[in-house]
A protein has these predicted regions:
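Mid-bilayer segments of alpha-helical transmembrane spans in multi-pass integral membrane proteins
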Residues: 71-77
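Interfacial loop at the N-terminal end of multi-pass membrane proteins
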Residues: 1-41, 82, 86-103
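Hydrophobic alpha-helical transmembrane segments
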Residues: 46-53, 126
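Internal alpha-helical transmembrane segments of multi-pass membrane proteins, especially GPCRs
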Residues: 28, 61, 103-106, 110-113
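Juxtamembrane boundary at the C-terminal end of a transmembrane helix
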Residues: 125-136
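Alpha-helical transmembrane segments of multi-pass integral membrane proteins
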Residues: 34, 69-70
Length: 136
């Protein structure tokens, strides 16, 4: 959320070559380090779907579905842009369509963020309902 609200608008003020280089190096590390957290989120939600009580299983299934959709959108829309920016940053090459690529990446982010929000909200509702049942 930090980068969406602060980093991205700040980078828009920088020259396109600088923006491409910075985003390329961010993706160089992010694309290697972030998948483990996504895998753990998917796995934990899958386990909750399989082993939770039937009352809350729907919320966990909704959460898992949102995460799967998030990964599909990332893989189809964001990852190819990440690769282009990373390759450009590594080689010092300038991308003629850098602004359009970043705008496309930002649009894909605006699709993915609500999916994460719905996933977290579904988990919260399931947890809240479970906690409420304990205290009744």
């Amino acid at each position: 959320m930090f980068f969406l609200t602060v980093g991205s608008p700040g980078l828009r003020l920088a020259p396109q070559a600088t923006s491409t280089e910075v985003m390329g190096f961010i993706h160089l590390f992010g694309d290697k380090r972030m998948p483990i957290w996504g895998i753990l989120a998917l796995l934990s939600n899958l386990l909750l779907v399989l082993f939770s009580g039937s009352r809350h299983r729907t919320f966990y299934l909704l959460s898992l579905s949102m995460l799967i959709l998030f990964v599909v959108i990332y893989d189809r829309l964001s990852k190819p842009i990440n690769r282009l920016q990373t390759a450009a940053a590594r080689t010092g090459r300038r991308l003629d369509n850098a602004g359009a690529l970043q705008a496309s990446w930002d649009r894909s982010l605006m699709m993915r963020v609500p999916l994460l929000a719905v996933s977290m909200l579904a988990q919260f509702i399931a947890l809240f309902c479970s906690a409420s049942a304990v205290f009744e």
